[in-house]
Amino acid sequence: MAKQVLLVDDSEFMRNLLREILEEEFEIADEAENGVEAVEMYKEYDPDLVMMDIVMPIRDGIEATSEIKEFDAGAHIIMCTSIGQEEKMKKAVKAGADGYITKPFQKPSVMDAISDVLTA
């Protein structure tokens, strides 16, 4: 059975791009547009992996990561961030992020990050 991934990004374009990259090897559990939805969907689906944008409305990826990790310390979360967001990445790691990819990204970097997180 394929591992389930929850895609979290306020940009439909970015969610679609991640879906295209991942759908051959993973099952997409669902998609969320903000951190509030991400936490709710995580609790509903219990996915193997979350691909989480950092900057989102309502609740950002850092806050959502922290809340998911409080609920499930073993959750695997990879942050998706833009170049120049180093300070936010440091906060995301403190919140419990397991890895990150930088936008714009290509399939090899996404798959490498996932492999690193899921085999750690």
UniProtKB/Swiss-Prot annotation:
Reported cofactor(s): Mg(2+)
An annotated GO BP: phosphorelay signal transduction system
Swiss-Prot/TrEMBL keywords: Chemotaxis, Cytoplasm, Magnesium, Metal-binding, Phosphoprotein, Two-component regulatory system
Post-translational modification: Phosphorylated by CheA.
Any one GO MF annotation of this record: metal ion binding
Location in the cell: Cytoplasm
Co-factor binding comment: Binds 1 Mg(2+) ion per subunit.
Consequence of gene disruption: Deletion leads to the loss of both chemotactic and phototactic responses.
Entry-linked PROSITE patterns: RESPONSE_REGULATORY
Entry-annotated residues carrying 4-aspartylphosphate: D53
Main location: cytoplasm
UniProt xrefs under SMART domains: REC (SM00448)
InterPro entries, alphabetized: CheY-like_superfamily (IPR011006), CheY_signal_transducer (IPR053548), Sig_transdc_resp-reg_receiver (IPR001789), ST_Response_Regulator (IPR052048)
One GO term describing the cellular component: cytoplasm
Response regulatory domain residues: 4-118
Chain sites annotated for binding Mg(2+): D9, D10, D53
Job description of the protein: Involved in the transmission of sensory signals from the chemoreceptors and photoreceptors to the flagellar motors.
Quaternary structure and interacting proteins, as annotated: Interacts with CheA.
Protein's name according to its UniProt entry: Chemotaxis protein CheY
Species the sequence originates in: Halobacterium salinarum (strain ATCC 29341 / DSM 671 / R1)
